[in-house]
Amino acid sequence: MYLPEKSVLLELISRCSSLRVFKQIQTQLITRDLLRDDLIINKVVTFLGKSADFASYSSVILHSIRSVLSSFSYNTLLSSYAVCDKPRVTIFAYKTFVSNGFSPDMFTFPPVFKACGKFSGIREGKQIHGIVTKMGFYDDIYVQNSLVHFYGVCGESRNACKVFGEMPVRDVVSWTGIITGFTRTGLYKEALDTFSKMDVEPNLATYVCVLVSSGRVGCLSLGKGIHGLILKRASLISLETGNALIDMYVKCEQLSDAMRVFGELEKKDKVSWNSMISGLVHCERSKEAIDLFSLMQTSSGIKPDGHILTSVLSACASLGAVDHGRWVHEYILTAGIKWDTHIGTAIVDMYAKCGYIETALEIFNGIRSKNVFTWNALLGGLAIHGHGLESLRYFEEMVKLGFKPNLVTFLAALNACCHTGLVDEGRRYFHKMKSREYNLFPKLEHYGCMIDLLCRAGLLDEALELVKAMPVKPDVRICGAILSACKNRGTLMELPKEILDSFLDIEFEDSGVYVLLSNIFAANRRWDDVARIRRLMKVKGISKVPGSSYIEKFMTLDQ
């Protein structure tokens, strides 16, 4: 019988990717008693680590040759499984190996904690933390670093800080681990505060996390400082840092800087394109977002994923570009993009905002797993397109099904009341959101809706009282609603001084508002304010022109 040489078997194992084929090779290894050879064992372990599906079989093989194995083989397998797409297999393999007689060492636990972090295995990780302490490995820096990372990514900031605080020595991995944990769980200020205390040289991963946190809290100066540092150090220039810089500038609404970094990237991936497209949408530059998406399709060779497509759908919704939105919808269906609640919600939002209510309802009813954002998309679309009563009906249905309305939900309800003239219902929803049941604090948009509703109903005095009670200054919508109501009632000269003063800080694009305010101040002999308004008009290049004023336009909105 032909027996292949050891070198041939090594080559066959290296090329092998099938468990069925490997079992045939294994027969030769057993026949020639090569499963005790170090080179063969290393190749076998490498093969078994190629797929999480091999985990059960790997425990059988390793158990059969356990007498000649070192911990290195077990740890190598655990490290391989920890980075696969089935991280729970790592825990299974660890427990199986231990039950078969394997004695863990300090290098065993980092991949196990890494796997626990990937699937948020808090219970499993804490159990193994206890084992680490009992076995005397807790003081090892590699183990402690892996614990900090595990607790951090699982949102257990208190435990992460506890381990970090107990470390006798901290290296760059320790500091980056705690900063990463803060960043991933939304504790951005804590991440930046920790970075400011860092007493070792940061690495690329540190800077990426700090850039993300800087963007989330609007700390542009720190972000720019890191950008300058990256440009001076070639080792820090990478696609990952480039993407983080784009994200930081976008979140700080510095789109020109974001576009410059985007343009300078030698290579762009989906994250690059998505960060830039979603950033343009966030900054209300939807037309540019769609143009950039078109450029991506024609020049990059990158196929859009669900994240990019939801951003494009949002841009279509903002522009009312239903034809482009419909194309994206069809692309999702034909390209095999995984349909989830996020994508379904974006499609409902696009059709609803574009006024295609029947299509929006059809998509909405077809979404099996809805969340509050899905309901908000439908309610908002119904409200702004003249279906106020139906919007309120869906609001009540949403509550009955156990969904908890948020600020956007209540804004949709108030919009529905405003567009339908339901004053009593509007009051009820406005007070309901502030009740103990929901404990939500109205934002400027909610006050604007409520004041608009009251003004349209001729309840100017109640609207003025609400303006006085607002914790924030009024905006253009509120000013327009109040002035419209005053004009209709012929009481322009009776506006309270504090309200008129608050209107002075608002910048308008329409000459009618400035002229009307100027006349009011003139009637009240507030000549300095008259001069101030006229200077503002001159600076902004606004002159009184014939035709409809902002007030008149405002009064005809949604009629």
Curated annotation (Swiss-Prot):
Gene3D superfamilies: Tetratricopeptide repeat domain (1.25.40.10). Residues 478-554 are annotated as: Type E motif. GO terms for biological process: RNA modification. PPR repeats lie at residues 70-104, 105-139, 140-170, 171-201, 203-233, 238-268, 269-304, 305-339, 340-370, 371-405, 406-440, 443-473. Keywords: Repeat. Pfam families: E_motif, PPR, PPR_1, PPR_2. GO terms for molecular function: RNA binding. Belongs to the PPR family. PCMP-E subfamily. This is Pentatricopeptide repeat-containing protein At4g38010. It comes from Arabidopsis thaliana (Mouse-ear cress). The gene is PCMP-E45.
